Amino acid sequence: MKYQEWLSEWLENYVKPSSKPKTYTRYAQIVESHLLPRLGGYELDELTPQLLQHQIVDMGKCGNKRTCKGLAPSTVNLIVAVIQESLETAYSIELTKVYSADKIKRPRIEEKKVECFSVAEQKVLEEALKNDKRPKTFGILLCLYTGLRIGELLALEWTDIDFDKREISISKTCHDSRDELGRYVRFVNPPKTSTSMRVIPIPKQLMPLLRETKKKNDSRYVVGNGERIISVRSYQRTYELILKKHGLPHRGFHALRHTFATRALECGMDVKTLSEILGHKNPTVTLNRYAHSLMDHKRDMMNRLGKLFI
């Protein structure tokens, strides 16, 4: 059996029934864009470790068909995962004599530096959002003070907020993806991990603004458009326009979450509590991601200690 035939069967009968739509769509895109053109014509038993490794290295050098530039290591690693999953399934049902994809060497991914807003930039952004007063833009402020991901924010309904207890319950997230006809649609699903399903306390200073926003908003969603969820791309654009209007540096929406975490550590919040609020798998993930913030905090504490004696 040729790899292209198996990939089609694998996607339809193995991935689709057991995966979220987002995962299936992403896998299908990888198969269509990268695996079929390069490996689809080979028989399954012709996919040797040497051949697979050669193709993976080549994707890192010139895998983008449009620009002829290399693909990002994270993208290449996802392609490797699809190759390995598809061939492991083929081996398990005896379509191939050996499983060779486990010998692929993955590209190393450099840890990206966490981007966040400085205290001065945060003050400018907060003031801009408070003066804006649109229910739609209040969500940006909410992320800045709770660490919500953009998908969690857009899927958030007013019924998820307990005004008496000052708590937000996170039980779903939304994302934009293509359906089987190639159209962009919005999917709402439970979070990927159980730790992402969590309850977040709301800072009491935010409650008056939250109540005011609810009075002006007739949508079931906190930042929605009537009964419809705002698309991720549309909301990112709203956020980018606010940054541009107020002379703030361009930073991705996730910088709001990083800013929340950084400020929380600077204020002395313990890592375990922060990890639970962010919905991380465990505190080690939080420590690894925000080690630089902890070091800055440690340095400040040591300087304060030095002032007592020197």
What does each model-identified segment do?
Residues 3-4, 11-95, 111, 229-234, ...:
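N-terminal core-binding DNA-recognition domain of tyrosine site-specific recombinases/integrases
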Residues 8, 12, 46-49, 61, ...:
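Phosphate-coordinating loops and pocket residues in cytosolic domains that bind phosphorylated ligands
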Residues 29, 120, 179, 203-249:
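Active-site/catalytic core of tyrosine-dependent DNA strand-transfer enzymes
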Residues 69-73, 77-79, 92-98, 102-156, ...:
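Basic, Lys/Arg- and aromatic-enriched nucleic-acid-binding interface segment
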Residues 74, 92, 141, 145-152, ...:
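C-terminal catalytic core of tyrosine-transesterase DNA break-rejoin enzymes
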Residues 103, 119, 155-212:
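Conserved tyrosine-mediated DNA breakage-rejoining catalytic core shared by Y-recombinases
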Residues 174, 207, 278-303:
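Catalytic-site neighborhood detector that most strongly recognizes the C-terminal catalytic loop/helix
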Residues 303-309:
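Short, basic, alpha-helical segments at the C-terminal edge of helix-turn-helix-like DNA-binding modules
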